[in-house]
């Protein structure tokens, strides 16, 4: 009992946002933990609504799993790089449009490959022979038929099954869909791209929930100049403390106290927790009192996938003028996918993107070994491939600041876990892509949950002041006229 009194007394003596300052300025205070798109959008919105806001970020930069690198002399994204849903309905569209940032559209709506159309590509077998495009298109139709049959199978099942198990059931019922030889290998490449979308292996992806996210219209567009200009614009003027790794969050009726790894403490009326799901799963942030069981179950039961990038910068272009290259194989694990950034940016860059178990295995390699592995895959299809002059390797799975790439639905767990993770706990509010039931795993999903967390926080905190009309509305206010997105496809 005495320790709780001491804790409350410490909060009243806040050295960051003191009670006296709050009474004088009538501005409530919020600590935002995590400087990714979810955290920054929440902080931006709350500060614009006259809150005192501080952002604590563990890295030495903002952006989180959005990381634009300039070491090649031009921008490349090591993390998220697509705008999923190139349309005015996308919550990020107004920001991107006003900045005049160009996008390169890689697919339209309802593409069998999600973020690519079957319009500009080259697939090869392990011997370097190009796969006929007619066969690729034909297998694409078969893949869509299999997915339709999977949906029928899952609707008949009481218990959830994995996508991999569902494939087996479909093949037993519809043997004509079972393929052999090169056709089978092409089908495995489609599975490989599906696994890339979820950053997970088919053995772990839920058949009941795999298609529950909302896909905005307009297809998918690459951010030609990277995402950094967007996050920097949103963060302008915010009080952001980088290098502040949070280790403990104490919540009481009269506020929150946040402790960082170096022993610093900060207090405020409320906190927005916008760290990656993988970090919450790791338990490196201690909560006092513990989070309620329903919240902890949501953290435990949501899946976190891994997709990495090995970005290869070459002296010149030596590959076909297509949007992507691929290698087909007997298993999805053996397949490869290279994104051709030259089509979008004009720079001689290929991006090798492994996901799931393959990504985990590559993370065990050194950067040099990982780059050599990617080049080896490239040499399977282009024997005269040049060595890269520079390379970059992401490690989202082993990075202590992320512990994974993005969330997905695992077998046997309900899709409403995303919403459960978003729901506030007293004066703790949650944001990030893993709290978006409509747009999980996306930048605009993280951004939109930051807006929602800010609104929830605003309403709860300001109720204590009893003067909601003193502050600007956070959401739904009229902003400047939207600017059309700059979209190209060469």
UniProtKB/Swiss-Prot annotation:
GO biological process terms held by the UniProt record: polyamine catabolic process; spermidine catabolic process; spermine catabolic process
Names of required cofactors: FAD
GO CC term, one of those recorded: peroxisome
Top EC class, one word: oxidoreductase
Main subcellular location: other
Pfam families, sorted: Amino_oxidase
Binding site for FAD: 57, 65, 246, 433
Key words, A-Z: FAD, Flavoprotein, Oxidoreductase, Peroxisome
Record text on cofactor binding: Binds 1 FAD per subunit.
Location of the motif Microbody targeting signal: 488-490
SUPFAM superfamilies registered for this protein in UniProt: FAD-linked reductases, C-terminal domain, FAD/NAD(P)-binding domain
Role, per record: Flavoenzyme involved in polyamine back-conversion. Catalyzes the oxidation of the secondary amino group of polyamines, such as spermine, spermidine and their acetyl derivatives. Substrate preference is N(1)-acetylspermine > spermine > spermidine. Plays an important role in the regulation of polyamine intracellular concentration. Involved in abscisic acid-mediated developmental processes. May contribute to nitric oxide-mediated effects on root growth.
Protein name: Polyamine oxidase 2
Organism of derivation: Arabidopsis thaliana (Mouse-ear cress)
Taxonomic path: Eukaryota, Viridiplantae, Streptophyta, Embryophyta, Tracheophyta
């Amino acid at each position: 009992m005495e320790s709780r009194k001491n804790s409350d007394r410490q909060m009243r003596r806040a050295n960051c946002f003191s009670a006296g300052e709050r009474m004088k300025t009538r501005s409530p205070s919020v600590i935002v933990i995590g400087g990714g798109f979810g955290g920054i959008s929440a902080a931006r919105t709350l500060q614009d609504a006259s809150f005192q806001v501080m952002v604590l970020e563990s890295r030495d930069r903002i952006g989180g799993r959005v990381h634009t690198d300039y070491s090649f002399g031009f921008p490349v994204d090591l993390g998220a790089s697509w705008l999923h849903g190139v349309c005015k309905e996308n919550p990020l569209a107004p920001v991107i449009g006003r900045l005049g940032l160009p996008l390169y559209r890689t697919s339209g709506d309802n593409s069998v490959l999600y973020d690519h159309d079957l319009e500009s590509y080259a697939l090869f077998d392990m011997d370097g022979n190009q796969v006929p495009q007619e066969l690729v298109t034909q297998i694409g139709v078969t893949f869509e038929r299999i997915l339709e049959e999977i949906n029928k199978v899952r609707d008949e099942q009481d218990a959830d099954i994995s996508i991999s198990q569902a494939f087996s059931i479909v093949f037993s019922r519809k043997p004509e869909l079972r393929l052999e030889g090169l056709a089978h290998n092409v089908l495995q490449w489609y599975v490989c791209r599906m696994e890339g979308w979820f950053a997970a292996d088919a053995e772990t992806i839920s058949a009941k929930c795999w298609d529950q996210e909302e896909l905005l219209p307009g297809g998918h567009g690459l951010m030609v100049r990277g995402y950094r200009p967007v996050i920097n614009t949103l963060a302008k003027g915010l009080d952001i403390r980088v290098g502040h790794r949070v280790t403990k969050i104490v919540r009481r009726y009269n506020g929150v106290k946040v402790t960082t790894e170096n022993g610093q403490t900060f207090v405020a009326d409320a906190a927005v927790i916008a760290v990656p799901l993988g970090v919450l799963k790791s338990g490196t942030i201690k909560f006092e009192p513990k989070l309620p069981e329903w919240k902890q179950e949501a953290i435990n039961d949501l899946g976190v996938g891994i997709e990495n990038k090995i970005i290869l910068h070459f002296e010149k272009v030596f590959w076909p003028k297509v949007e992507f290259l691929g290698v087909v194989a007997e298993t999805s694990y053996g397949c490869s996918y290279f994104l051709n950034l030259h089509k979008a940016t004009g720079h001689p860059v290929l991006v090798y993107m492994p996901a799931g178990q393959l990504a985990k295995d590559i993370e065990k390699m050194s950067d040099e070994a990982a780059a050599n592995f990617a080049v080896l895959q490239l040499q399977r299809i282009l024997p005269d491939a040049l060595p890269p002059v520079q390379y970059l390797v992401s490690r989202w799975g082993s990075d202590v600041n992320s512990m994974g790439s993005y969330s997905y639905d695992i077998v046997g767990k309900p899709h409403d876990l995303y919403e459960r993770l978003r729901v506030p706990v007293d004066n703790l509010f949650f944001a990030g892509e893993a709290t978006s039931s409509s747009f999980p795993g996306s930048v605009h999903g993280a951004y939109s949950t930051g807006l929602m967390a800010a609104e929830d926080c605003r309403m709860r905190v300001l109720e204590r002041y009893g003067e909601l009309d003193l502050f600007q509305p956070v959401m739904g206010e009229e902003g400047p006229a939207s600017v059309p997105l700059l979209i190209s496809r060469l």
